Amino acid sequence: MSSTKFLKPLCRIRAFHTSIARSFTIPFLPKIPQKPGGVSGTANDSSYMPPESRAQGSYHWIVERGLSLAVLPLIAVPLVTTGPISTFTDTFLSLVLLGHCHIGFQSCIIDYISERVYGKVHHYAMYLLSLGSFLSFVGIYKLESQEAGLIASLKSLWDNKPVEKKRQ
């Protein structure tokens, strides 16, 4: 057997494993031209430090970790209890899940649609995320105040039974 029989399939596979710069960009979004190496100025210039912000520093990290840790017991409560959970717990679970999802999608936008590369598209994505989170908050309010709540709605989907509305 010749070695060319084995090398041809490997060459085809190798093409999928190479990393090209264009494979790390979003093709339909306009990009800002970048300087070589992404460095502005000369080697002797000091780097740009963004202004300090309480919303973006360690407080942001603490809130993110707190929401992530709060999700675990709040999801376990409806699984452990057989009856309905309190309205406060249901609302708190809904809001914690909304905050957790908002921060997670915000991190994805910051990582993959960076302001340095995509410019205003980054801001549009953040505005759309904020709008979606606000509309979700309104939906949570409606679900908790006029319907049976998040957990009861999920249980009705699971059991395939209609949900009874809250009495006012």
Curated annotation (Swiss-Prot):
Stretches that traverse the bilayer: 66-86, 93-113, 121-141
Reported consequences of knocking out the gene: Does not affect SDH or TIM22 complex formation.
Binding annotation for heme: 101
Organism: Saccharomyces cerevisiae (strain ATCC 204508 / S288c) (Baker's yeast)
Topology in membrane: Multi-pass membrane protein
Location(s), subcellular: Mitochondrion inner membrane
GO molecular function: heme binding; metal ion binding; ubiquinone binding
Subunit structure: Interacts with SDH3.
Mitochondrial intermembrane side: 87-92, 142-168
Function: Homolog of SDH4, but seems not to be a stoichiometric subunit of either the succinate dehydrogenase (SDH) complex or the mitochondrial inner membrane translocase TIM22 complex.
Annotated binding of a ubiquinone, by residue: 112
Similarity comment text for this entry: Belongs to the CybS family.
Keywords: Heme, Iron, Membrane, Metal-binding, Mitochondrion, Mitochondrion inner membrane, Transit peptide, Transmembrane, Transmembrane helix
PANTHER family, per the entry: MITOCHONDRIAL INNER MEMBRANE PROTEIN SHH4-RELATED, SUCCINATE DEHYDROGENASE
A Pfam family per the record: CybS
Mitochondrial matrix topological intervals: 24-65, 114-120
Name of the coding gene: SHH4
Feature: transit peptide: 1-23
Name by which UniProt lists this protein: Mitochondrial inner membrane protein SHH4
